[in-house]
Structure formats: C-alpha cells, structure tokens
C-alpha cells in the first residue's frame, strides 16, 4: 500500500516536472547585447510584487510549456519590476527609481523606465522590435491562448499590416480558423 502511494505520488510529481517549462528571463541590457549578434523581438513582462494577476500570469501563462518554449525560441524574454530599485540602461540612457522606498511591502514608486514606456497598469506585456524599439503594450492578464495570438502577431510582423480595430479582428479570426 505504501509502495503504491509512493509510485502514484512519483508519477504525479514527474508529470508536473514535464509540464513545467521555464522561460529564459534576462535583463533588457542583456537583450540589447544579444540583439547585436542574434536579432530577435523582445517581450517584456512588466509586473509588481503586490499584483495578483501578475502572479497568476507567471503561474498559468509563463509556466505553460508551449508558451515558454515559444518564447525561448522566438523572443528575448525580459522580466521587469515596475516598482523595483534596479537601474536600467536602455539605449544608452540610465533609468532608475528615485522615489523607491526600501522595506515597503505594498505599492512603491513607479520606476522611470516604466513611465518612459507609458505603462500604468499591471501586468503589462511590452513588445519590442529587433532594434529594441517599443512596438506595443498589452495591459492585463493573458491566458496561454490569449498571449499566443500576440506572440504570433509580433513574431510574424503581422502588426505592421494592422491599421484598425477591424484589421485586428480579421487577424484574430484568420488565426483562430487555422487552429
């Protein structure tokens, strides 16, 4: 009986290990460096420590093996704390968070890089092109299915063809019909 329970628990644990895939998160500085030798679009997950939907997106979306594999293969993935204390060197300009209060357990001051990107809600995903120019911010929790649409939109540069809400709806409709 004990051996059977051990076997079942081992199977469950090993199944969870197979299902869980880690995104190779790097800094924006590292992504800019890698762009020089192997250009890829960048996806930046902008989060805060207190944000519940941010934590859910980490758990449910970014730990999804299909999403993680797609990100690792097609993008440089950057994770950035919108209220953190780290300095950011983006395109030769230094951004920091002068209002950061150490030891704060809730909300903190917004980082200047977050402000530069025009991000005011969390979670927000910002896509950058291969020249590290911001393309678009997507604010709000995204499921694996929802983020997949955006990942393909930006990987395949289809966003360049979208000029209106109708164009975007058409893209989604065409994308879903292929699935």
Show where each model-derived region lies.
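Structural microenvironment flanking redox-active thiols in thiol-disulfide oxidoreductases
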Residues: 73-90
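Typically the conserved alpha-helix immediately C-terminal to a functionally engaged Cys/Sec
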Residues: 54-72
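Thiol-/selenol-based redox modules, centered on thioredoxin-like
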Residues: 134-179
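Short, internal strand/loop/helix patches
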Residues: 94-117
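Short active-site neighborhood of thiol/selenol oxidoreductases, capturing the structured segment around
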Residues: 38-52, 77
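A short beta-strand-turn-helix
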Residues: 24-42, 71
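Bacterial Sec-dependent N-terminal signal peptides
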Residues: 1-22
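A short, hydrophobic beta-strand/beta-hairpin element that forms part of a small beta-sheet core
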Residues: 113, 121-137
């Amino acid at each position: 009986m004990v051996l059977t329970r051990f076997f079942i628990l081992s199977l469950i644990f090993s199944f969870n290990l197979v299902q869980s895939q880690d995104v190779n998160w790097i800094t924006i500085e590292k992504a800019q460096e890698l762009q020089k030798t192997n250009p890829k679009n960048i996806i930046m997950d902008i989060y805060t420590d207190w944000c519940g939907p941010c934590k859910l997106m980490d758990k449910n979306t970014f730990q999804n093996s299909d999403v993680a594999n797609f990100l690792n293969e097609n993008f440089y993935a950057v994770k950035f704390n919108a209220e953190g204390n780290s300095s950011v060197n983006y395109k030769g300009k230094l951004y920091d968070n002068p209002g950061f209060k150490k030891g704060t357990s809730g909300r903190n001051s917004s980082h200047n890089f977050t402000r530069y990107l025009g991000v005011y809600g969390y979670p927000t995903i910002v896509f950058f092109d291969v020249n590290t120019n911001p393309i678009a911010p997507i604010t709000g929790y995204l499921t694996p299915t929802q983020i997949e649409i955006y990942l393909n939109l930006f990987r395949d540069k289809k966003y360049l063809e979208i000029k209106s809400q109708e164009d975007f709806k058409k893209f989604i409709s065409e994308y879903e019909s292929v699935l």
